[in-house]
């Protein structure tokens, strides 16, 4: 299979095949493996990104720093590094799991469904951003507490996966601990 794909999973989270990425995301999306990463700079600010309008699901919505899908034979950590370079042009370090068993299903206003087992990580950015406009239309560095308050006050302005990740008490505490070094 050429191009990006998703790793399909059975209900127990075991690999159960692969499917082309764009064919996978429909109104009846099968359960598949993904990842989500919250990136912090040296000043302790969180990178929040706004998804490009060309994205199939949740175009123009604010979300956490970077998301994607590991490819067959690729570790989640290697996939996060690959997508951080592709979407944001950055190098990262200190990649740490903060919500390894996160799973969700959500439907965007266009009817596209996300149905993912999506381990959540935090990492430190070690280089300047060079944003890929096909992936990210805007971005903002902000304090973690400010972002958490915004997620609570206006969840409709953010991706559902970011809102759900931040609503988990343990994940929120691990993000705070990570950010404090």
Swiss-Prot record:
Binding site for Mn(2+): 25, 32, 69, 114, 116
Annotated pathway: Isoprenoid biosynthesis; dimethylallyl diphosphate biosynthesis; dimethylallyl diphosphate from isopentenyl diphosphate: step 1/1
Residues the record lists as binding Mg(2+): 87
Active site, UniProt feature: 67, 116
Name of the protein: Isopentenyl-diphosphate Delta-isomerase
Gene Ontology annotations of biological process type: dimethylallyl diphosphate biosynthetic process; isoprenoid biosynthetic process
GO terms for MF: isopentenyl-diphosphate delta-isomerase activity; metal ion binding
Localization, UniProt: Cytoplasm
E.C. designation(s): 5.3.3.2
Cofactor: Mg(2+); Mn(2+)
Superkingdom classification of source: Bacteria
A family per Pfam: NUDIX
Domain annotation Nudix hydrolase: ranges: 30-164
Cysteine pairs bridged by disulfides in the record: none
